[in-house]
Amino acid sequence: MKKILAFVLIMAASLPQAISAKKNEVPSELKVMSYNIRLATGKDGTNSWEFRCPATIEMLKDQKPDVFGVQEALINQILFMKEYCEDYDNVGVGRDDGKKKGEFMSIFWNKKTVKMIKWGTFWLSETPEKPSMGWDAHCKRTATWALMKDKKTGKKFYFVNTHLDHRGKEARKNGLKLIVDRIESINPEGYPMVLTGDFNMKPDNPAFVGLDARMKSARKVAPKTDNHNTFNAWSVKPSDKVIDYIYFSGFSSCLEYQTVTKKYLDRPFVSDHYPIIARLIF
């Protein structure tokens, strides 16, 4: 009886200290980005990759995301960013063969602030474990996921990056559903989750219903946000083309959502999509 009483007294004495430590815990911020880089093609004239690649590096060094997902990147673009952004590493595969062929839905992270634990890629199709085209898609589409750890707090989180089909309506709907189902199955621990990507559909599309029920749109919930279009088509003219997104779950809040429209190295655009950023709090 005396031992039990002593244990209770010790626990009671330590409780205020635990509560005080929790109150004094400094919130940790995770800055994430989604960036459709526009694949390297000669069809873009003066907006081709060879002309805007230095501006991309300048943008990344200026914005300093902890983690970012790129869409449409070819292997030469991946290697260029790794060479000139020394603080970053990446994972991902080419969508055409699961190796280096085709566009990458790659995830980059700052090695100083984030640690990679494990990662994988699946295809948005009826056979997601192998390179394949799903439903009415025009191209092979993938999602890359990674389990990561914030070095400051030691907290783990998942980051998922994708690019839905630009033509197939069923492919977009079913692809997004597959992503939602998959990210739930790989995260039984319920770690915080980030989903980035070019979804090729506007916010009012019915295909968002399932995702909206499980995750929050940074654009919609951040107290500091904007209403800028994310697809620019190499034009500064405003439009309603909001097709790039950052969704999250498990974080305490989203401080800010931002569409990056700033010019770098006098280049009017770093892509035909504007990068988008969210500042999340654990």
What are these regions (language model features)?
Residues 170, 174, 183-193, 201-282:
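Metal-dependent phosphoester-hydrolase catalytic domains
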Residues 34-54, 100, 124-138, 165-168, ...:
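Acidic/histidine-rich helix-loop elements
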Residues 30-37, 56-81, 108, 146, ...:
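Active-site beta-strand/loop signature of hydrolases that rely on acidic residues for catalysis
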Residues 4-13:
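Sec-dependent N-terminal signal peptides
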Residues 67-158, 253, 258-260:
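Structured beta-strand-rich core segments of catalytic domains in phosphoester-bond hydrolases
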Residues 46-51, 72-75, 166-174, 202, ...:
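Soluble non-cytosolic domains of exported or imported proteins
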Residues 29-41, 105, 117-122, 155-165:
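Active-site-proximal beta-strand elements of phosphoester/diester hydrolases
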Residues 2, 15, 19-84, 97-102, ...:
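N-terminal, active-site-proximal structural segment of metallo-dependent hydrolase catalytic domains
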